[in-house]
């Protein structure tokens, strides 16, 4: 099933919410994911994202970033499990990162994607590059940093056409978030995929923690979440 409207409609028909937020979404009292972040709700059911941001279920909007095999010794012998790091996004201001474990790769991937949905964030985009000033949300409006373990990542606004000057894992996360042009600096053991991915994700989250002045919104073309209007509605 590749139509976001069909995905959302199917979830609404089959889903039995377990949380207050889930019931509000199911009953149609919350119809925009931006409202969830504005009111400070915590997403504890992946179906909430399936309904409000169904495009994240499209194959091109999901990325498996890392698969690792873990072995643990028990009284009954070795227990082998898979650990999967996955990301989801709508390529327009929303991105999530999650880790899933399972005895089979497929199960671990599904868990990771569901955790990524529940961990989805809304980011600020804009054009903060002094080389550009086009006021379009192709980059980020200001420099931000994120860290995880020994890894530190700094993202800086880039001019249109620059592309994503960052490692492959970072490119995938930024692309899913809808960021097209950035410079980056990294410190620490960046070959550790999980920590590097989390540092990039944390940097994007920190776009929400920088105070902005009203005049900066127009100057840098800042948008929060979606820049493009939704092209579908769920009945």
From Swiss-Prot:
Q: What is known of its domains?
A: The N-terminal domain interacts with the head of the 30S subunit; the C-terminal domain interacts with the body and contacts protein S4. The interaction surface between S4 and S5 is involved in control of translational fidelity.
**Organism taxonomic ancestry:** Archaea, Methanobacteriati, Methanobacteriota, Thermococci, Thermococcales
Instruction: Report the protein's function.
Output: With S4 and S12 plays an important role in translational accuracy.
* Cofactor note as given: Binds 1 Zn(2+) ion per subunit.
Which residues of the sequence carry a binding annotation for Zn(2+)? 127, 132, 134, 138
Q: Which GO terms describe its biological process?
A: translation
Regarding protein family, the annotation reads:
Belongs to the universal ribosomal protein uS5 family.
UniProt-listed NCBIfam families:
PRK04044.1, uS5_euk_arch
Task: Give the organism the record lists.
Answer: Thermococcus kodakarensis (strain ATCC BAA-918 / JCM 12380 / KOD1) (Pyrococcus kodakaraensis (strain KOD1))
Q: InterPro entries per the record?
A: Ribosomal_Su5_D2-typ_SF, Ribosomal_uS5, Ribosomal_uS5_arc, Ribosomal_uS5_C, Ribosomal_uS5_euk/arc, Ribosomal_uS5_N, Ribosomal_uS5_N_CS, Ribsml_uS5_D2-typ_fold_subgr
One family name in Pfam for this protein? Ribosomal_S5_C
- Gene3D superfamilies according to UniProt: 3.30.160.20, 3.30.230.10
Q: Which cofactors, by name?
A: Zn(2+)
This chain's protein is named: Small ribosomal subunit protein uS5
């Amino acid at each position: 099933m590749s139509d976001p409207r069909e995905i959302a409609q199917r979830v609404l028909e089959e889903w039995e919410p377990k949380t207050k937020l889930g019931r509000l979404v199911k009953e149609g009292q919350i119809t925009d994911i931006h409202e969830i972040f504005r009111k400070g709700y915590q997403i504890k059911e992946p179906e909430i994202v399936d309904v409000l941001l169904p495009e994240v279920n499209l194959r091109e909007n999901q990325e498996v970033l890392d698969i690792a095999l873990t072995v643990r010794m028990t009284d009954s012998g070795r227990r082998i499990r898979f650990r999967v790091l996955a990301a989801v996004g709508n390529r327009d201001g929303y991105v999530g990162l999650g880790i899933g474990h399972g005895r089979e790769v497929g199960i671990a991937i599904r868990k990771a994607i569901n955790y990524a949905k529940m961990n989805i964030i809304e980011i600020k985009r804009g054009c903060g590059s002094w080389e550009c000033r086009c006021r379009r949300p192709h980059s980020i409006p200001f420099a931000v940093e994120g860290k995880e373990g020994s890894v530190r990542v700094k993202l800086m606004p880039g001019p249109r056409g620059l592309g994503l000057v960052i490692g492959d894992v970072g490119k995938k996360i930024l692309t899913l978030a809808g960021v097209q042009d950035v410079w980056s600096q990294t410190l620490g053991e960046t070959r550790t995929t999980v920590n590097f991915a989390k540092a990039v994700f944390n940097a994007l989250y920190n776009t929400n923690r920088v105070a902005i002045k009203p005049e900066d919104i127009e100057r840098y073309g800042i948008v929060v979440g979606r820049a493009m209007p939704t092209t579908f509605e769920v009945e």
